[in-house]
Amino acid sequence: MRLRRSPLVALALVVLGSLGACADRSDPVGVQIQQGTVIALADGAIEGEVVGGTRRFLGIPFAAPPVGPLRWRAPQPPVPWGGTLAAKSFGSACPQRPSTLGTPSENEDCLHLNVWTPDPAPAAPLPVMVWFHGGGNEFGSTGDFIPLGLGGLIFDGRLLSERRDVVVVTTNYRLGKLGFFAHAALAGEDPDAPYAGNQGLLDQRAALRWVKSNIAAFGGDPDNVTIFGESAGSADVCVHVVSPASRGLFHRAISESGGCTTR
């Protein structure tokens, strides 16, 4: 069955997302906002750095490495780390087909996300915006850059965070045959993923669960989360909008350029 995108639906998604940045920030979230560049999380402490008017935390694991018996499985909780994790560089990109983008080194251990939050830490919780990159669900990563010295990061959340007073999250997810490979041999084996071919979408949902559990420590409001994306990331936003399993993990959505269609 094909669901055709309605222009009114697309417009509504954009309007709802725009309202998210203006939402009330006064509601307490029950977790104390942490100051400085070291944040204590349930899985361990992380140390970021101040960049411009933001505190930036890069390469935070939000799921266990999807390797070995976890390949083509639903993402599992991250393995706690001892000590303090240096969160100052992007994690590896997920394995993918070649593209014209500059991409970090690839590794199956790629389920990491990044957080930008205004510096100094806010006095009250801020709206949260979670970004899904494009690339046809076949290439791309949060650390992509314009190659040949022609520019910097493509998905840098710093300016959005410091200029619009929001907490920005960007996340990797599995791509291509490791993230969207539908095969009868893979269906039904994983109770958390009974249908094969949705691992990349499940990674995005796991990132949203991480945000719900952890973003308050960064000054974000887990009850005011907007998801947004472009191209394939935009289409993925539409999937989460209509998926009952993603309900409650976000509150607004912005679909930028990717069609809200499915078969």
Predicted features, each with a name:
Residues 218-230:
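Alpha/beta-hydrolase fold nucleophile elbow
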Residues 134, 199-203, 231-234:
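Active-site loop->helix "elbow" adjoining a glycine-rich segment at hydrolase catalytic centers
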Residues 1-9:
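Bacterial N-terminal signal peptides that target proteins for export
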Residues 110, 193-216:
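Alpha/beta-hydrolase active-site loop
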Residues 234-245:
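Short glycine-enriched nucleophile-adjacent loop
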Residues 18-21:
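C-terminal motif of bacterial Sec signal peptides marking the signal peptidase cleavage site
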Residues 23-198:
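Non-catalytic accessory segments of hydrolases
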Residues 247-259:
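A conserved short beta-strand
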